[in-house]
Amino acid sequence: MKKGIHPEMKLVTVKCACGAEHTFYTTVDNIRIDVCSKCHPFYTSGGKGGVLIVDTEGRVEKFRRKYGDNY
């Protein structure tokens, strides 16, 4: 590898909207994500059909106010 042409890798803590933190090596300083493996429905349902909804912007509540719970 040539010296001086590669970006510097640093250990960064990635924060999810659910509060979970993951640590990665990356060239980016700050990373925030909306969904991770601790809160994504694919990983959290456990095959039992349960669904966990992560709504950081209130879209679900807006939909329920507009159409009600019997959509």
UniProtKB/Swiss-Prot annotation:
Residues annotated for Zn(2+) binding in this entry: C16, C18, C36, C39
Listed cofactors: Zn(2+)
Presence of the UniProt keyword Metal-binding in the record: yes
Classification via InterPro entries: Ribosomal_bL28/bL31-like_sf, Ribosomal_bL31, Ribosomal_bL31_A, Ribosomal_bL31_sf
GO cellular-component term (any): ribonucleoprotein complex
Cofactor note: Binds 1 zinc ion per subunit.
HAMAP family named in the record: Ribosomal_bL31_1
Source species: Thermotoga sp. (strain RQ2)
Keyword rRNA-binding in record: yes
Gene Ontology molecular function: metal ion binding; rRNA binding; structural constituent of ribosome
Family per similarity comment: Belongs to the bacterial ribosomal protein bL31 family. Type A subfamily.
Pfam families listed in its UniProt record: Ribosomal_L31
Function: Binds the 23S rRNA.
One BP annotation, GO: translation
Name listed for the protein in its UniProt record: Large ribosomal subunit protein bL31
